[in-house]
Amino acid sequence: MLPYIVLVLGCWSVLSQAAQTDDEERAGNRRPIWIMGHMVNAIGQIDEFVNLGANSIETDVSFDDNANPEYTYHGIPCDCGRNCKKYENFNDFLKGLRSATTPGNSKYQEKLVLVVFDLKTGSLYDNQANDAGKKLAKNLLQHYWNNGNNGGRAYIVLSIPDLNHYPLIKGFKDQLTKDGHPELMDKVGHDFSGNDDIGDVGKAYKKAGITGHIWQSDGITNCLPRGLSRVNAAVANRDSANGFINKVYYWTVDKRSTTRDALDAGVDGIMTNYPDVITDVLNEAAYKKKFRVATYDENPWVTFKK
């Protein structure tokens, strides 16, 4: 009887290891997806969107006349079906976000791993962009990263709508270096969100001295239709040997059909007002084998080619 039990246990161990290896291989071959909760501008919305399935959020940042980040505010017009006027003081939002992304905090949301700051620099003159970057860095360092002492752990994407505002990137980096925390740039990525020609976007990054950590967005309000031609161009750049893009995301996607189209195109992120819709599609048999929700272990700056 004993040899039989040993044989059974041995077979079970082999099968378990094989199953684990199979799971790991399936996970490794599936594209990690960032489900980006759109227009999360009030602290209470952080939990709301994460609980619906978002593993990342997008937050609007408005600036005052002196290039100080002021509010997490979008304003009218915004997406159809949304309240455009919710907001917080920027630094208050950062503190709430820090609580949600700091392990051990009572408000901690483990699934929230990336934050896109949609920087509303349209109110600024071009010559204020560098200063805006410096002031943004100081605010994040103090109120989100807690001056480098057990601050929030989420990765950050600085999304800039105007290619001419590329000096914001240098100002941000220079300020973190001046304040003694250049290592925090490891947690920071970049995006130009103005739907510009991909070639022009690449030129802006060259001017900014940036290689790597690049997300490329494409999209339009959910009130209007938009094709995937530019998404396809961004994905082609990402997958090419000499491309500069690491990740591609599409906004604002609220329909299952559009979600499927975006996934089929090979995007890495989908920005949405309804994270549960994206989650539902990812759980469909045809997509569950190809995609998975990204976790904190995923490096959002690493390219996953189609």
Swiss-Prot record:
Source organism phylogeny: Eukaryota, Metazoa, Ecdysozoa, Arthropoda, Chelicerata
Main location per the UniProt record: secreted
Record has NAD as a keyword: no
Active site: 38, 74 (nucleophile)
EC number: 4.6.1.-
Enzyme class label: lyase
The protein's name in its UniProt record: Dermonecrotic toxin LiSicTox-alphaIA1a
The protein's role, per its UniProt record: Dermonecrotic toxins cleave the phosphodiester linkage between the phosphate and headgroup of certain phospholipids (sphingolipid and lysolipid substrates), forming an alcohol (often choline) and a cyclic phosphate. This toxin acts on sphingomyelin (SM) with high activity. It discriminate between the number of carbon atoms in the substrates, since it prefers SM with six carbons in the fatty acid chain (SM6:0) to other SMs (SM12:0 > SM16:0 > SM18:0 > SM2:0 > SM24:0).
Propeptide regions on this chain: 19-26
Catalysed reaction equations from the record: an N-(acyl)-sphingosylphosphocholine = an N-(acyl)-sphingosyl-1,3-cyclic phosphate + choline; an N-(acyl)-sphingosylphosphoethanolamine = an N-(acyl)-sphingosyl-1,3-cyclic phosphate + ethanolamine; a 1-acyl-sn-glycero-3-phosphocholine = a 1-acyl-sn-glycero-2,3-cyclic phosphate + choline; a 1-acyl-sn-glycero-3-phosphoethanolamine = a 1-acyl-sn-glycero-2,3-cyclic phosphate + ethanolamine
Top-rank lineage group of the source organism: Eukaryota
Cofactor (UniProt): Mg(2+)
Family: Belongs to the arthropod phospholipase D family. Class II subfamily. Class IIa sub-subfamily.
GO cellular component: extracellular region
Signal peptide: 1-18
Tissue specificity remark: Expressed by the venom gland.
